[in-house]
C-alpha cells in the first residue's frame, strides 16, 4: 500500500531536491529503526526523485502514522516562521562575524503539542555531504527538509560572507583625535600687524606644523605675546626725546583735527543735499496742488454753464 503524501514527501519531491542531487554520507553506520511500541511499523518509502551515489548507503525514510491535518499545519507554520526569521529583511535577522564552534544547526523550538505518535519511530539524525570542502546538509526530525550549513555549522541563509570584523577590533577614536587628523588650513594673518611679528608667527607655525595642529586660542596667545615683545623691544631700542614726543603729539592732533573737519564737511554736505531735495519736493507738490485747483475751477464752470 502506498504511504500517505505528507510534508516530508512534499519537501523531498520539490524542485530543490530534484534539481540538486544530494549525496548522503553518514559518519557512523546507520542504526536500524526501533519498532514502535503501540503502532505497527510503516513500510519504508524512498523518494523517487532523490538520487544517491552507488557508494552511499541507502537512506530509508520512516513515515509516521496517525498524523492529523493539524500536525501538518503546525509543521508548515513553524517552517514558514523559520524561513521568515532567516530572511535578511526581517528584524530578527542576525549576521555573525565570528565562526560558531558548533558543528550542527540547532533549530528553533516548536510549540508544545500533545504527541500523536511514538517518537521512537523516528530515524537518528543523519548528515548528508554534498562535497567535503563546501557544505553539508543536516537532517533534523523537527526540520524535515535538509538545511544547508557551512563547515562551521552556520546556516548559509543567515551568514554574511562580506561582513566587517567585530567592533571591538577597531580602536576607539575620540573627537580630539579626529580633529587632529584633519588637514591644517592656511591661517589668515591681519595686515596691520608689524612685519617682525608676522615673521615670528610664521616661523613658529612652520616649526609647530610638523608636531601638532595649533588651536585658535594658542594662535591668539602667540599674537599677543609677539606684539608685547615687539613693543618692549621698540621702547628699549629708541628712547624718544621731549621734542620728538611734542612733534608726535602735534601730528596726532593735526590728524585728528583733519578727520573732524572732514566729518563735519561731509555732514554739512549731506544736510544741504537733503534740504535741497526737500525744497524741490515741496515746490513740486505746490505746483501739483495749483494744477488741481485750476482743474477744479474749470470743472465748476463747465457744470454751471450747462445748467
Swiss-Prot record:
Record region (Leucine-zipper) = 278-285
> What is the official name of this protein in its record?
Transcription factor zip-3
An example of a GO molecular function for this protein is: DNA-binding transcription activator activity, RNA polymerase II-specific
Q: Where in the cell is it found?
A: Nucleus
> Which stretches does UniProt call biased (Basic and acidic residues)?
266-286
Q: One Pfam family of this protein, by short name?
A: bZIP_2
Q: What does this protein do?
A: Transcription factor which negatively modulates activation of the mitochondrial unfolded protein response (mtUPR). Plays a role in response to infection by the Gram-negative bacterium P.aeruginosa.
Task: Provide the coiled-coil residue spans.
Answer: none
**SMART domains reported for this sequence:** BRLZ (SM00338)
From which organism does this entry originate? Caenorhabditis elegans
Q: Which PROSITE patterns match?
A: BZIP, BZIP_BASIC
The segment annotated Disordered runs over: 24-51, 259-286
Is Coiled coil found in the keyword set? yes
Membership in a protein family: Belongs to the bZIP family.
Q: GO terms for biological process?
A: mitochondrial unfolded protein response; negative regulation of innate immune response; regulation of transcription by RNA polymerase II
A Gene Ontology cellular component where this protein is annotated is: nucleus
Which of UniProt's keywords are assigned here? Coiled coil, DNA-binding, Nucleus, Transcription, Transcription regulation
Amino acid at each position: 500500500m502506498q504511504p500517505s503524501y505528507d510534508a516530508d514527501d512534499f519537501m523531498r519531491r520539490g524542485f530543490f531536491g530534484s534539481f540538486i542531487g544530494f549525496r548522503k554520507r553518514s559518519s557512523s553506520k546507520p542504526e536500524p529503526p526501533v519498532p514502535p511500541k503501540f503502532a505497527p511499523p510503516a513500510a519504508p518509502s524512498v523518494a523517487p526523485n532523490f538520487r544517491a551515489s552507488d557508494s552511499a548507503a541507502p537512506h530509508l525514510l520512516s513515515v509516521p502514522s496517525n498524523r492529523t491535518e493539524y500536525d501538518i499545519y503546525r509543521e508548515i507554520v513553524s517552517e514558514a516562521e523559520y524561513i521568515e526569521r532567516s530572511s535578511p529583511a526581517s528584524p530578527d535577522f542576525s549576521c555573525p562575524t565570528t565562526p560558531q564552534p558548533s558543528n550542527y544547526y540547532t533549530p528553533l523550538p516548536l510549540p508544545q503539542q500533545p504527541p500523536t505518535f511514538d517518537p521512537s519511530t523516528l530515524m537518528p539524525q543523519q548528515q548528508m555531504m554534498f562535497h567535503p570542502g563546501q557544505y553539508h546538509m543536516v537532517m533534523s526530525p523537527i526540520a524535515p527538509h535538509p538545511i544547508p550549513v557551512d563547515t562551521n555549522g552556520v546556516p548559509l541563509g543567515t551568514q554574511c560572507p562580506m561582513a566587517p570584523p567585530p567592533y571591538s577590533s577597531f580602536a576607539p577614536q575620540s573627537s580630539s583625535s579626529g580633529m587632529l587628523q584633519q588637514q591644517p588650513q592656511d591661517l589668515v594673518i591681519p595686515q596691520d600687524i608689524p612685519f617682525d611679528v608676522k615673521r615670528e608667527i610664521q616661523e613658529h607655525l612652520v616649526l609647530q606644523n610638523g608636531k601638532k595642529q595649533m588651536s585658535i586660542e594658542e594662535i591668539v596667545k602667540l599674537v599677543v605675546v609677539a606684539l608685547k615683545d615687539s613693543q618692549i623691544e621698540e621702547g628699549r631700542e629708541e628712547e624718544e626725546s621731549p621734542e620728538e614726543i611734542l612733534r608726535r603729539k602735534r601730528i596726532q592732533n593735526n590728524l585728528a583735527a583733519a578727520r573732524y573737519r572732514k566729518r563735519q564737511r561731509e555732514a554739512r554736505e549731506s544736510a544741504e543735499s537733503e534740504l535741497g531735495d526737500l525744497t524741490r519736493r515741496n515746490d513740486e507738490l505746490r505746483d501739483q496742488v495749483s494744477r488741481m485747483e485750476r482743474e477744479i475751477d474749470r470743472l465748476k464752470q463747465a457744470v454751471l454753464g450747462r445748467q
